[in-house]
Amino acid sequence: MSVRLRDPHFKLRFRLTRVHNLAARYAYGDDVAEGIGEVVRPARSYTQAQFLELCRWKSVRTQPRCEENDAALVEAVTTVALTTPHEQLRIEVLTLLRGVSWPTASVLLHFGHRDPYPIVDYRALWSLGIDEPPARYDFPFWWAYVRTCRKLAADAGVSMRILDRALWQYSKENQATLRSP
């Protein structure tokens, strides 16, 4: 029996014309992550060191678990994720790695894949009208999020990295003040 999940309703909380301005105020260092992406995209896999650096960039808390993955497994799993044409396999295979949840998997795709992928993060989701992130991510939610972000980036004429920075920054500046008690 198959259960069809309802697509989430994403609604941008700010005007799309503000993307550049918001992204320019983003100050969470991502130069190292972007540099890793420049090396990984043509290689089509992560080394263990690159993997650990991006996992640390996303979440220091999960670092000990991420370090439990051996280099061969990291390379094998990330090669599948970065070379398969199957969208669901791209994201879900990454969660086979210890310490990698959907948000961290999205970081690995965001920086390492040739196609544009957003980073799934509570801040970005909030900027898209989702007050509480799902307790458990699944592919239908992820794919709706990817499609929404790709359309927004295209409509704004920006890269996925610029859109991600803008979504994160808007939440940082507004989420606490706009939350209802």
Identify the meaning behind each predicted range.
Residues E87-R90, T104, Y145:
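N-terminal alpha-helical segment
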Residues M1-E53, S59, P118-P181:
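C-terminal accessory module of base-excision DNA glycosylases/AP lyases that mediates lesion recognition
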